[in-house]
Amino acid sequence: MPVKIDRDPSEAIRSALSKGIAGFNRHTIPDLEPNEAEIRFHAIATDENGNLLGGLRGTCYWNTLHIELLWLADRARGTGVGRQMIENAEAFAVQNGCEKALVETTSWQARPFYEKNGYKLLATLEGRPKGHASHYLSKTLASPKS
């Protein structure tokens, strides 16, 4: 069986892979289905003139908020804007069934920021990227629904 690397597979292949894993998950753990819909969103911060101060990109999936990125302009750092974006994203996530949050950050980025906002370190992967480390943190957002 030939296996090839494809950096840009067709939409049909991407869709078939997504449907395949969703079907496997549904068959294996039937009650996962209500939580499988991905909800992608952004929390955007602007100043009074509409200039971009920063943003957060997140996805709600399997009752978990995945914070994919958070960026702040230099002039917005230390002003509470990042905290507001996190709080708004977490509130949105809870409204959409999320009970926890997960984020990856690197050694030169924002681990102390996330910890200050209630995130706990799960693991550190040294040497990713080379000479640095990736940190994985999580936070409980809400009690599980019965």
Where are these regions (language model features)?
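Conserved active-site tyrosine of GNAT-family acetyltransferases
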Residues: 17, 114, 119
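Conserved GNAT acetyl-CoA-binding A-motif
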Residues: 93-106
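Conserved GNAT-family N-acetyltransferase fold
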Residues: 43, 54-56, 65, 70, ...
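A short, internal acetyl-CoA/4′-phosphopantetheine-binding micro-motif in the GNAT/acyltransferase core
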Residues: 70-77
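Conserved catalytic-core motifs of GNAT/GCN5-like acyltransferases
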Residues: 102-104, 120-138
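Conserved N-terminal entry element of GNAT/NAT acetyltransferase domains
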Residues: 1-11, 143-146
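A conserved beta-strand-loop-helix scaffold within acyl/acetyltransferase catalytic domains
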Residues: 34-35, 48, 56-65
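Conserved acetyl-CoA-binding loop-helix of GNAT-fold acetyltransferases
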Residues: 78-91, 116
